Structure formats: C-alpha cells, structure tokens
Swiss-Prot record:
One of its GO terms (cellular component) is ribosome. The gene is rpmB. It comes from Lactobacillus helveticus (strain DPC 4571). GO terms for biological process: translation. Keywords: Ribonucleoprotein, Ribosomal protein. The lineage of its organism: Bacteria, Bacillati, Bacillota, Bacilli, Lactobacillales. Signal peptide: none annotated. This is Large ribosomal subunit protein bL28.
Length: 61
C-alpha cells in the first residue's frame, strides 16, 4: 500500500481480538487519496491521507 506524502502514515499491523481473547493478525490501512498538491510551487500527484486534507496541512493544486 502507498504511504502518506505529508504525515508518513502507512499500513500498521496488529491483532484482532475476540471476546475469548483469540488473536488473528490484521492490518489497519490509512484512508489515502491520490491528489494534486503544490510541492515547491509545482503541482505533483501524491498519496495524501484524508486527515491531512481536512486539517489543512496540504494546499491543493
């Protein structure tokens, strides 16, 4: 999976736990969207998390 260009978020791994505390490996993926942003004044198409988009850490091109 891709990595967030701004915050560096990527897939994290851990265990899913049932009520009986049985464990199964699983992955948590960030909500990434491919958007055009301004990097050094030029538009660039990169993967950005929706959290970074909502918080205003990115200026769209």
């Amino acid at each position: 999976m891709a990595k967030d260009y701004v915050t560096g978020k990527k897939t994290t791994f851990g265990n899913k736990r049932s009520h009986a505390m049985n464990s199964v490996r699983r992955a948590w993926k960030p909500n990434l969207q491919k958007v055009r942003i301004l990097v050094d004044g030029k538009p660039k198409r990169v993967w950005v998390s929706t959290k970074a988009l909502k918080s205003g850490k990115v200026t769209r091109a």
